[in-house]
């Protein structure tokens, strides 16, 4: 495990900002500044530049500006910022960036990209040279770009610092106490606070005025795979976007303050956010690094590379880091890799590894006898997809663990005394001591999962009346749409609530929570069986919200099933194949919001609609909950009744957690759209099947692309 501290002449995010904005379509930032070199410098012909201008006007000017000046978060391709970043950079890097344009890449031929490069150089003051070979991106990869700076490097730094300082200097250090009980104005974690309740005490936007919400600002983003979770502190929004890029944004108006992009050769993968603690931002990357950045400048402080035994393939960092005290905890997903996933804890100041908890126990360890006698080299899964929850009083961090895809060897138990096929700690809640990584308790919600029906999502810490006492509980739902409540201190089973969308579990023991499996759903490669819920999950990645004032939990659900049998695609190794199927009880609906009274263990209300719910649910003290769907509608509901009080059509699918915050006495509502994920793609396919069967139109109007949308109320009239 390696941790590197990095210092550079110019902090990369500041230099990246300069007088330019962040790139929304592609990252026009070379990976390193070129040192003085005797390498050849590229040149171009006037003919190339003239042709390049025509191509630029047609294909690029609408985003990057007629004069290459950029707009909003689309970068400029000229001027001081561009010159500083690209002077002396390898031609190969410019070629890579150009070939990704327009968004989606590959729309122009190689000659067109060469002519575009020539025009960009010409616009930046580099003279054509007819006595040298024309620019040839494919043949001149070892060449360097010419100097375009004219000694402007120092001026750029001072200009940037002056532009961002006024907002960034207001940032105060984030403490454990703030993460446990954030200032009302802030949204400091993926689900706002350590308890993951997804609830804000802000109430300026309420039932009476929510219909007056209007767009305050919109920032375009680069399209790509992402599950973004904005966090806001002291008027600054920190946003992790595609590809592996952190933005610091003025939360009042959407102005970019700084930007940091992690460069790697690995294709950027979807993430669920970043973390704040002290004066640092903690970032997971697609090539298995965890970074610490300065919250005020974006400067890299340390870089920890997570070591694996078999390289990077098959591993991912999906969740936001989770910080408690002086430990930065990061879950690792391991899809089909021997020995499975784990949680690692890093020292907050140095990035050095402190402890590691393996989610699949080794033979001879507690739980090691639950893998049907398989050697550790044949055990896989146990991914950690989501950030944890933390209770300060109990000093326990709670995580969920995913199942394995290698289900075949576990399907039937072996006849060996002391060996079972439960497959710990898959589908379990694990409670860890954050200081040592010691396992304090665990509870397995569904043993020997043969259907990819994860119980891997957010753990929420709540306090509710139960059995004549006030109990602190950890609650979560799995893909089946069954909620389990456990005692937070001991893991003792309390109760379950079934949303009625599944047929796999036929009975739940009221004392232990043990789930009896319906024998008609056990995988059989020779017989097609209807399995509900789908492995996409009735409950999945979008987190729920809990209102502590009313003891109500608000859950986003989607109704769907699978046919498991001899036809379809092979996800698991039991021999069955899977094909999408509709829920026979859908009655023309697929999306659902369920309100649960956890104090009474009763259903409060239910809202159903045709389109799947795609975003998180967010609750506020204004008596509202918010949710967004696949048809690009963002809605506000009355938390008491489920009545729709406001809705607006977005220009793309709301694919993030919904958050709220306040700056200078004004409450804002924010959501990101247009950055896709497994979840969005899966339910888009399910909805297409559903709409076709139900004869419903599909919203196929042009999409506006990835962006952050922020709403607020109109100014009050005096």
Which stretches of residues belong to each language-model region?
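Repeat-blade elements of multi-bladed beta-propeller folds
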Residues: 187-191, 223-245, 266-290, 314-340, ...
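Aromatic (tryptophan-biased) beta-strands that constitute blades/sheets of beta-rich domains
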Residues: 160, 164-221, 225, 255-264, ...
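The canonical Cys-X-X-Cys-His
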Residues: 52-67, 116-120
